[in-house]
């Protein structure tokens, strides 16, 4: 049971925080995990610690991204991966961005946001979407930031061979409310439609003059 698993004196993240997450204070609040009588307080502190780790990871990511003075900086996405095989999970930075977007959309404290998670309240999305990894062989071409159509190269040369380019795309689900309108919108008074929207990611491409280079291209990223 939870009460039996609650004592966490043996669980110590001291000395491990900098190894797993450089610069993060993962040991914060773990001193309060005292024993069975402190089970509720201990688990709450642990949850707060995980939230703190996520927030600090986001801060670290923002620190290494281009300056916000660059108008294209906010168009960059972490949905591209170079790999020898199909990735099994969504990219970590993508998950962090999704979490950050959810936090930004809710103007409330983190603890209130956690307890108001839509998944806990049984809420449904206005538009259904699906996400999956696709290869350059499936994309073939894309539109770059200048509006030109470029060829997306399937493989990227590396010192020990070649790696494939994978793109994590999100689009409206064919089983969703794309044609019938958005969920929750009164059709008697409003017309609505779910549409797939795009963002820019950086990929290795070739233009119509056979010039190969890294360019920002548009891929499906939301519904």
UniProtKB/Swiss-Prot annotation:
UniProt KW Mitochondrion keyword: no
Subcellular location: Secreted
Keywords, ordered alphabetically: Cleavage on pair of basic residues, Disulfide bond, Glycoprotein, Growth factor, Secreted, Signal
Residues bearing carbohydrate: 107
GO cellular component terms, semicolon-separated: axon; dendrite; extracellular space; synaptic vesicle
Gene Ontology molecular functions: growth factor activity; nerve growth factor receptor binding
Pfam families, per database record: NGF (PF00243)
Record-linked SMART domains: NGF
Record function comment: Promotes the survival of neuronal populations that are all located either in the central nervous system or directly connected to it.
Protein name: Neurotrophic factor BDNF precursor form
Source organism of the structure: Ramphotyphlops sp. (strain YPM 13663) (Blind snake)
Lineage of the organism: Eukaryota, Metazoa, Chordata, Craniata, Vertebrata
């Amino acid at each position: 049971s939870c009460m039996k698993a609650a004592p966490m004196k043996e669980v110590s993240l001291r000395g491990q925080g900098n190894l797993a997450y450089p610069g993060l204070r993962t040991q914060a609040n773990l001193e309060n995990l005292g024993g069975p009588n402190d089970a509720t307080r201990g688990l709450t502190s642990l949850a707060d610690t995980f939230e703190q780790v996520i927030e600090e990871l986001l801060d670290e990511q923002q620190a290494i991204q281009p300056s916000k003075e660059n108008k294209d900086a906010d168009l960059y996405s972490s949905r591209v991966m170079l790999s020898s095989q199909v990735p099994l999970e969504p990219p970590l930075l993508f998950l962090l961005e999704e979490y950050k977007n959810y936090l930004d959309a809710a103007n409330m404290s983190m603890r209130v946001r956690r307890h108001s998670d839509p998944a806990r309240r049984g809420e449904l999305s206005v538009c259904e979407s699906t996400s999956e990894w696709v290869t350059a062989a499936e994309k073939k071409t894309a539109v770059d930031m200048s509006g030109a159509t470029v060829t997306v190269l399937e493989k990227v040369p590396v010192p020990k061979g070649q790696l494939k380019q994978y793109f994590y795309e999100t689009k409206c689900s064919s089983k969703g409310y794309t044609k019938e309108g958005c969920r929750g919108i009164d059709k008697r008074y409003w017309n609505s439609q779910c549409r797939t929207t795009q963002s820019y990611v950086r990929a290795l491409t070739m233009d119509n003059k056979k010039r190969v280079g890294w360019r920002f291209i548009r891929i499906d990223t939301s519904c």
